[in-house]
């Protein structure tokens, strides 16, 4: 008969490799038994960081140069067959000495590609997913096995020479990408599962993750017998925010371009708030001339004006973008919540997951702006040169 693990017990492995060669040959130091704290933080809008602290009784810090690879594998309590693994690099590390004279190493964790901060200088593809794969392929070309998993969708972005970093490209995709299959704006983020993409329709139509709200001390050892995971310390950071929500109900979006003399508009309500978007330069390659991409994203997300946080026992299945429905005896939670940020806090014998979520305080309205197809000539230089050669 197998023993049940205590709820929140992390099945944790933390392996320290001194190089890619050591990783390839599985030559490592196991740190799980020596850690004091491990924090992993991921958000829907591009924040990925972590902190690892562990006792250094063997003076490992004297041999470290900051180019180490940290491989973290975790699994929920009583779910050891569902192990999730991610690779971190070392942004920087420090060493302190405690009251007993023992060394404690603190490593700020980050993805290897964000630490290297490689700046590109080349065009990629109009498909954002293909560009992401190509960028990571370049960054990890000398250590291909470390490349994070990529879960992409077909999303169009203007095809321009990219002269910045991978992280800035993800921000660019969030701002301008349009899913080819749905004409909806796109979310792209990184977490323990890799680099992920989904459009707005995918987010709202996904299967919800049910949780119940309660107090762990009242449930005690029976917490593992609950049908759904328990959320506690639930706090509304913002229950309703008309200051951010309502201006988008009374706005006009002007799409200005230096390539023609027209200024198409999208108006909601009386249109008293002015928003100017560009259709010049790279933005002249957008799918729609009238600012549809910006309008649907701004007007839709402005409706999600509620923000809340809660905690639960360590649950590594919860990642950014997950849809959650809460149940409680008083029926206080009437809307669906979407995970904006996840923070996992672990020691070598316990774990807690903190969730930050957005939701809507008022009834959601369907946003469907008019579409005006972009008819700019995207390759005028070639056309002019061809016509002059014919003459």
Curated annotation (Swiss-Prot):
Compartments (UniProt record): Virion
GO CC, alphabetical: virus tail; virus tail, baseplate
Protein's UniProt name: Baseplate central spike complex protein gp27
Induction remark: Expressed in the late phase of the viral replicative cycle.
SUPFAM superfamilies given in the database record: Phage tail proteins
Protein keywords: Late protein, Viral baseplate protein, Viral release from host cell, Viral tail assembly, Viral tail protein, Virion
Quaternary state and interactors: Homotrimer. Heteromultimer with gp5 trimer and gp5.4 monomer; this interaction forms the tail lysozyme complex that creates an extension of the tail tube. The T4 tail lysozyme complex is made up of three copies of the proteolytically processed gp5 and three copies of gp27. Part of the baseplate macromolecular complex which consists of gp5, gp5.4, gp27 (central spike complex); gp6, gp25, gp53 (inner baseplate); gp7, gp8 (intermediate baseplate); gp9, gp10, gp11, gp12 (peripheral); gp48 and gp54 (proximal region of the tail tube).
General function of this protein: Baseplate central spike complex-associated protein involved in the tail assembly.
InterPro entries: Gp27_dom2 (IPR043085), Gp27_dom3 (IPR043083), Gp27_dom4 (IPR043084), Peptidase_S1_PA_chymotrypsin (IPR043504), Phage_T4_Gp27_C (IPR015180), Phage_T4_Gp27_N (IPR015181)
Domain of life of the native organism: Viruses
Broad class of the protein's primary localization: virion
Organism whose genome encodes this protein: Enterobacteria phage T4
Gene3D superfamilies documented for this protein: 3.30.1920.40, 3.55.50.20, Bacteriophage T4, Gp27, baseplate hub, domain 3 (2.40.30.150), Trypsin-like serine proteases (2.40.10.10)
GO biological process: viral tail assembly
């Amino acid at each position: 008969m197998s023993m049940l693990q205590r709820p929140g017990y992390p099945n944790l492995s933390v392996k320290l490799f001194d190089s890619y060669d050591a990783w390839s040959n599985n030559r490592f130091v196991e740190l799980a038994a020596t850690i004091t704290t491990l924090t992993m933080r991921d958000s829907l809008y591009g924040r990925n960081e972590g902190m690892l602290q562990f006792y250094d009784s063997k003076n490992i810090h004297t041999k470290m140069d900051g180019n180490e690879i940290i491989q973290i594998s975790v699994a929920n309590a009583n779910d050891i067959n569902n192990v999730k693994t991610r690779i971190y690099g070392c942004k920087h590390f420090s060493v302190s000495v405690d009251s007993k004279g023992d060394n404690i190493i603190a490593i700020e964790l980050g993805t290897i590609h964000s630490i290297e901060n490689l700046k590109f200088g080349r065009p990629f593809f109009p498909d954002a997913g293909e560009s992401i794969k190509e960028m990571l392929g370049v960054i990890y070309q000398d250590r291909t096995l470390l490349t994070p998993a990529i879960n992409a969708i077909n999303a169009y972005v203007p095809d321009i020479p990219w002269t910045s970093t991978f992280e800035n490209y993800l921000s660019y995709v969030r701002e301008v990408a349009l899913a080819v299959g749905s004409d909806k704006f796109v979310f792209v983020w990184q977490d323990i599962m890799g680099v992920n993409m989904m459009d707005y329709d995918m987010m709202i139509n996904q299967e919800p993750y049910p949780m119940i709200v309660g107090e762990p001390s009242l449930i005690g050892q029976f917490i593992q017998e609950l049908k759904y995971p328990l959320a506690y310390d639930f706090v509304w950071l913002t229950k309703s925010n008309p200051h951010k929500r309502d201006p988008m109900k009374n706005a006009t979006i002007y799409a200005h371009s230096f390539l023609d003399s027209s200024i198409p508009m999208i108006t909601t309500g009386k249109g008293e708030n002015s928003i100017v978007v560009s259709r010049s330069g790279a933005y002249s390659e957008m799918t729609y001339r009238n600012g549809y991409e910006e309008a649907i994203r701004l007007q839709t997300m402005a409706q999600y004006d509620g923000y809340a946080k809660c905690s639960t026992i360590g649950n590594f299945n919860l990642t950014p973008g997950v849809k959650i429905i809460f149940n409680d005896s008083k029926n206080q939670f009437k809307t669906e919540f979407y995970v904006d940020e996840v923070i996992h806090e672990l020691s070598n014998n316990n774990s807690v997951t903190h969730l930050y979520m957005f939701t809507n305080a008022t009834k959601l309205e369907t946003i469907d702006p008019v579409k005006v197809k972009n008819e700019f000539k995207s390759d005028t230089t070639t056309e002019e040169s061809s016509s002059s050669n014919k003459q």
